[in-house]
């Protein structure tokens, strides 16, 4: 390996020199005549007929292939596919070979007799290893041939598409081949592959003095007639027998046969037969869609842009600049080869390589002269996949590559003011050179600020990492342009804050940006008052719409939701209720929406908001406020949603409807509609008491003539009333609706007050009230049977006969005193169902009333009294007989005795009763005295137990004293002690012998008590545990 002597100041271009004989072990090397490298696969002609295949990537030993060539023939051209799978080798005398580099097998293409100077590889078969696919061959005579050959060397397609491509360029055809006619390069592109049957293709064909661009669509291959005319060029190319065989189908024939083919030619203006170098065409990049081309022609080196998808074919290749050839000692010195990188063009001369910048002024940034012992340059080939360029001499190869060639390009663009290009490069170098991006951004922003384009400057600075405070200072003025820039800056900064950790900063930017927008809108509204121009009004509307759309973005609306109280305060500070209403709607803050609409007295809009939402507490809260302004609409809304609305919660709303007729009538309609829902009412009538009270109030004030019918429809049973009786009575008294007051008195059981009130205006109503006492009597029996005493607490004491008579007598007194009509007074006896008697009426009848009028009444009274007296006499007689019978039984009981048999046993201990003191009960249960005390102890109170224990002690003490007196012979003392002993025994008998402990009242009263206490039960339960 020879030491690198390249003069490269900045190290952008690198070179590695390889001695093919020593380093790659090409032992049979005499002189390299041709070399090609693609995708790391090298194929070199090391002698006139010996080829060497070397895989750079694998490092395996090279393979040698000897072609069947006879002198003076030798290898002239080697064409490698981009993948390095296929090779076409052409000799000086027109012999051609296909080499499959995977197997290192070569095949002689005997039917192809011409010098192949260029190959256009098919991009559709870029990954195919078994076949080349349809490809285009360019010859030294200027003809184009389509070939398809497989890995076995079998040609499925071989057809000459045109004998002279110069015909397309309308150039003069010469019979003899010349350097100008030879095809130097073919670039094949597929433009559309959506429809595999109708693909669009482009081919760029290069000759020494011209470039030809053709675009066509696929068409079916033409039918070739057998035995046709064969051109002289074809004869020279050895293709004379192709027309006599069945012509295979071709793919690219339409380039040269279709009338729809588009073509464009670029020609050199300084063509000279003395220009002996072949023209070279190279493009970059070659793997993807090419963007730039370089063409070596007699005019110089043309460098320009490539756009294979251009609308006009003339715009496919557009020259950017041309580098003229240098004259040395009066003759041209064209390069041996050219190659393109991203930002440089490499020119290979016989003893040096130059790298020129593609940017003006196209300075030489790299020069690499090499030692003469390396030999002169024979060729300059590019490895399109590996992006290396190979220069070769007879025994050496030099491998050129790039090393971060964009490191100074961005500065060049920046100095020239091409900020977008500089920015594009700087972004790709952020990891390598982060300061580059910052410098470009600042320079571009400063340029925009100088141009007063603050919006563009803000967009640029938002991408910069310059401290936010220093950036903002550039826009903090009262200038409208700078304010627009500030808005843009805040907006762009906000777009970049997408992480969860940036929430605080995002909220701050949203609030700041909102404040700026509100200030702008406030200023525009102020100017609108002094400028009623419709265009300005439309501008204000558009600005408002723009602001609203902007703040509806997801990250912005989330911040507004979080800080909505601060947003509301900001809107209020700018008096912008429109925006506040917009934000409230955006975050679904219904309360604020309604508050703003109520403040603006937009009551119908408030109702619409409630209609669009589910029934909630807000509905019940707003109805009292709305019903004062739009009562009809509110009531219609309530009726339409009565299934979802709780009527009890509407009490405050309906209570307000007593103010005027306009509100009352809709409220009455709603309540009537609600009362018709019998199912709802029957579930819990008491819950609707307030609604019925409101209804009574409304009816009493605005529909008093219908109130009595409503009250009567609910009956007189107080427990069934849906309204509060006391409230109804007060309301009717307040509005002086006397028939309703009388009716309610009757419902309340205040018949005396009802009759007294009714006598003031209607005596018939008074009698009707008196008759209602009988209905109350029937209902009272039902009410007395209720289990809950509290439920009957409102019922007055049952009226006795005397009270009823007093009420009827008030009516009779009215007839006598007010109407002076004794006959009607006497008729009350029948009307009261004979509750009144003539005796009751006599005190109020005037003294001088004729007896004749009273005679039928008196006779009837005596008849009824006679029966009653006879019944009373019979009852007294029966009572006397029963009393006598009871007295006789009592006398007999005084002499009753009980006989005790010797076989009778104690009911407690089951032992014979005789032998010890015992007690006998009338139920024939016998107990020893001690057993009775034990049996009765559980029925006695603590006080009685203590008393009995004391008496037993006294009894034992007196008994011992009595025995002592007896032994002493003191008869008198013995009698005294005996009497005392009997008294104590009598006291004990009264305590324990009052009732039988087994069947007496005391035992019956203890029947619901447990046999065992909780402690006893637990103790007994433990005895059963194993």
Curated annotation (Swiss-Prot):
Explain what the record says happens when changing residue 923 to A.
Fails to rescue the defects in germ cell corpse clearance in the vps-18 (tm1125) deletion mutant
The segments annotated as RING-type zinc fingers are 906-932
The outcome of changing residue 925 to A is: Fails to rescue the defects in germ cell corpse clearance in the vps-18 (tm1125) deletion mutant
Q: Which residues form a coiled coil?
A: 858-896
| A GO MF label | protein-macromolecule adaptor activity
Signal peptide range in chain numbering? none
Q: Which domain of life is it from?
A: Eukaryota
Q: What are the subcellular locations of this protein? A: Cytoplasm; Late endosome membrane; Lysosome membrane; Early endosome
Tissue specificity statement from the Swiss-Prot or TrEMBL entry: In hermaphrodites, expressed in coelomocytes and gonadal sheath cells.
Keywords, A to Z, come to:
Autophagy, Coiled coil, Cytoplasm, Cytoplasmic vesicle, Endosome, Lysosome, Membrane, Metal-binding, Transport, Zinc, Zinc-finger
What Pfam families does UniProt report for this protein, alphabetically? Pep3_Vps18
Q: Which GO terms describe its biological process?
A: autophagy; endosome organization; endosome to lysosome transport; lysosome organization; organelle fusion; phagosome-lysosome fusion involved in apoptotic cell clearance; regulation of vacuole fusion, non-autophagic; vacuole fusion, non-autophagic
User: Knockout consequence?
Assistant: Temperature-sensitive defects in the formation of gut granules during embryogenesis. At 15 degrees Celsius, pretzel-stage embryos have a reduced number of gut granules in intestinal cells, and at 22 degrees Celsius, pretzel-stage embryos completely lack gut granules in intestinal cells. At 25 degrees Celsius, many embryos arrest by the pre-bean stage before elongation, and 76% of these embryos contain gut granules irregularly distributed throughout the embryo. Defective apoptotic germ cell corpse digestion with delayed degradation of chromatin in late germ cell corpses.
Q: Which InterPro entries match?
A: Pep3_Vps18 (IPR007810)
Any one cellular component term from GO for this entry? clathrin-coated vesicle
Its placement in the membrane is given as: Peripheral membrane protein
- Subunit-structure text: Probable core component of at least two putative endosomal tethering complexes, the homotypic fusion and vacuole protein sorting (HOPS) complex and the class C core vacuole/endosome tethering (CORVET) complex. Their common core is composed of the class C Vps proteins vps-11, vps-16 and vps-18, which in HOPS further associates with vps-33.1, vps-39 and vps-41 and in CORVET with vps-8 and vps-33.2.
PANTHER family attached here? Answer: VACUOLAR PROTEIN SORTING-ASSOCIATED PROTEIN, VACUOLAR PROTEIN SORTING-ASSOCIATED PROTEIN 18 HOMOLOG
This chain's function reads: Plays a role in vesicle-mediated protein trafficking to lysosomal compartments including the endocytic membrane transport and autophagic pathways. Believed to act as a core component of the putative HOPS and CORVET endosomal tethering complexes which are proposed to be involved in the rab-5-to-rab-7 endosome conversion probably implicating sand-1, and via binding SNAREs and SNARE complexes to mediate tethering and docking events during SNARE-mediated membrane fusion.
Q: What is this protein called?
A: Vacuolar protein sorting-associated protein 18 homolog
């Amino acid at each position: 390996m020879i030491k690198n002597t390249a003069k490269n100041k900045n190290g952008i271009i690198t070179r590695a020199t390889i001695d093919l004989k020593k380093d790659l072990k090409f032992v049979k090397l005499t002189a390299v005549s041709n070399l090609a490298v693609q995708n790391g696969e090298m194929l070199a002609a090391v002698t006139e007929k010996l080829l060497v295949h070397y895989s750079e990537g694998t490092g395996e030993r090279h393979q040698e292939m000897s072609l069947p060539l006879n002198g003076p023939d030798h290898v002239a051209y080697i064409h490698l596919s981009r993948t390095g799978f296929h090779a076409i080798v052409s000799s000086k005398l027109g012999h051609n070979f296909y080499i499959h580099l995977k197997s290192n097998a070569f095949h002689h293409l005997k039917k192809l007799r011409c010098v192949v100077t260029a190959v256009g590889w098919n991009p559709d078969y870029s990954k195919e290893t078994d076949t080349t696919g349809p490809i285009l061959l360019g010859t030294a005579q200027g003809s184009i041939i389509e070939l398809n050959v497989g890995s076995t060397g079998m040609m499925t397609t071989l057809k000459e598409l045109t004998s002279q491509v110069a015909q397309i360029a309308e150039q003069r055809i010469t019979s003899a081949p010349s350097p100008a006619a030879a095809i130097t390069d073919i670039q094949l592109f597929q433009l559309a592959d959506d429809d595999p049957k109708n693909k669009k293709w482009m081919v760029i064909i290069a000759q020494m003095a011209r470039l030809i661009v053709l675009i066509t669509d696929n068409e079916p291959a033409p039918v070739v007639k057998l035995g046709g005319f064969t051109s002289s060029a074809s004869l020279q190319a050895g293709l004379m027998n192709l027309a006599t065989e069945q012509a295979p189908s071709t793919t690219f024939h339409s380039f040269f046969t279709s009338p729809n083919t588009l073509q464009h030619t670029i020609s050199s203006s300084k063509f000279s037969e003395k220009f002996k170098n072949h023209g070279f065409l190279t493009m970059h990049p070659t793997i993807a869609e090419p963007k730039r081309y370089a063409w070596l022609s007699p005019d110089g080196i043309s460098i320009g842009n490539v756009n294979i998808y251009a609308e006009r074919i003339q715009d496919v290749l557009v020259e950017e600049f041309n580098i003229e050839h240098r004259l040395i000692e009066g003759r041209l010195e064209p390069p041996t080869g050219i190659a393109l990188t991203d930002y440089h063009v490499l020119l290979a001369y016989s003893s040096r390589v130059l790298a020129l910048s593609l940017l003006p002024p196209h300075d030489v940034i790299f020069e690499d002269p090499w030692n003469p012992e390396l030999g002169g340059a024979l060729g300059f080939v590019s490895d399109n996949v590996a992006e290396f360029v190979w220069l070769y001499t007879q025994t050496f190869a030099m491998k050129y590559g790039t090393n971060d060639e964009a490191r100074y390009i961005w500065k060049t663009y920046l100095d020239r003011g091409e900020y977008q290009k500089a920015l594009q490069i700087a972004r790709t170098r952020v990891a390598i050179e982060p300061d580059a991006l910052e410098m470009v951004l600042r320079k571009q922003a400063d340029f925009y600020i100088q141009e007063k384009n603050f919006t563009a400057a803000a967009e640029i600075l938002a991408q910069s990492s310059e401290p936010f405070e220093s950036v903002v200072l550039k826009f903090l003025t009262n200038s409208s342009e700078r304010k627009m820039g500030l808005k843009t800056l805040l907006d762009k900064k906000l777009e970049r804050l997408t992480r969860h950790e940036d929430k605080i900063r995002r909220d701050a930017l949203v609030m700041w940006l909102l404040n700026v927008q509100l200030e702008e809108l406030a200023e525009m509204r102020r100017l609108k008052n002094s400028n009623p121009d419709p265009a300005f009004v439309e501008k204000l509307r558009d600005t408002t719409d723009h602001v609203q759309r902007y703040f509806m973005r997801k990250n912005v609306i989330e911040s507004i939701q979080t800080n909505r109280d601060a947003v509301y305060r900001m809107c209020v500070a700018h008096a912008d209720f429109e925006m506040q209403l917009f934000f409230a709607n955006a975050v679904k803050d219904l309360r604020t929406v309604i508050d703003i609409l109520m403040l603006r007295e937009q009551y119908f809009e408030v109702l619409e908001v409630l209609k669009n939402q589910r029934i909630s507490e807000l509905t019940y809260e707003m109805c009292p406020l709305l019903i004062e302004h739009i009562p009809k609409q509110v009531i219609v809304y309530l009726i339409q949603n009565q299934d979802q609305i709780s009527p009890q919660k509407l009490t405050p709303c309906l209570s307000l409807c007593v103010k005027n007729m306009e509100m009352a009538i809709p409220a009455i309609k709603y309540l009537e509609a609600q009362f018709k829902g019998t199912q709802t009412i029957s579930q819990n009538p008491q819950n609707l008491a307030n609604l019925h009270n409101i209804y009574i109030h409304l009816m009493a004030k605005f529909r008093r003539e219908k109130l009595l019918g409503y009250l009567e429809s609910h009956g007189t049973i107080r427990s069934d009333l849906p309204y509060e009786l006391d409230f109804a009575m007060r309301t009717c008294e307040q509005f002086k609706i006397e028939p309703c007051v009388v009716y309610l008195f009757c419902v309340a059981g205040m018949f005396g007050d009802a009759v007294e009130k009714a006598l003031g205006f209607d005596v018939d109503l008074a009698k009707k009230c008196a008759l209602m006492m009988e209905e109350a009597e029937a209902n009272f029996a039902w009410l007395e049977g209720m289990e809950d005493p509290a439920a009957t607490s409102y019922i007055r004491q049952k009226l006795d006969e005397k009270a009823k008579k007093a009420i009827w007598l008030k009516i009779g007194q009215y007839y006598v005193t007010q109407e002076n009509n004794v006959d009607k007074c006497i008729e009350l006896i029948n009307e009261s169902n004979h509750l009144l008697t003539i005796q009751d009426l006599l005190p109020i009848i005037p003294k001088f009333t004729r007896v004749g009028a009273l005679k039928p009444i008196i006779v009837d009274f005596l008849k009824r009294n006679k029966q009653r007296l006879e019944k009373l006499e019979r009852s007294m007689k029966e009572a006397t007989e029963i009393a006598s019978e009871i007295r006789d039984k009592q006398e007999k009981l005084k002499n009753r005795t009980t006989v005790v048999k010797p076989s009778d046993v104690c009911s407690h201990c089951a032992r014979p009763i005789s032998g010890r003191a015992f007690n006998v009960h009338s139920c024939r249960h016998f107990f020893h005295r001690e057993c009775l005390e034990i049996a009765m102890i559980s029925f006695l109170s603590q006080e009685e137990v203590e008393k009995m224990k004391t008496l037993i002690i006294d009894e034992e003490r007196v008994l011992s004293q009595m025995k002592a007196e007896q032994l002493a012979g003191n008869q008198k003392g013995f009698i005294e002690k005996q009497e005392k002993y009997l008294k104590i025994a009598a006291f004990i008998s009264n305590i324990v012998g009052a009732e039988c402990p087994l069947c007496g009242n005391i035992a019956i009263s203890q029947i619901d008590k447990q046999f065992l206490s909780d402690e006893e039960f637990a103790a007994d339960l433990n005895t059963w545990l194993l």
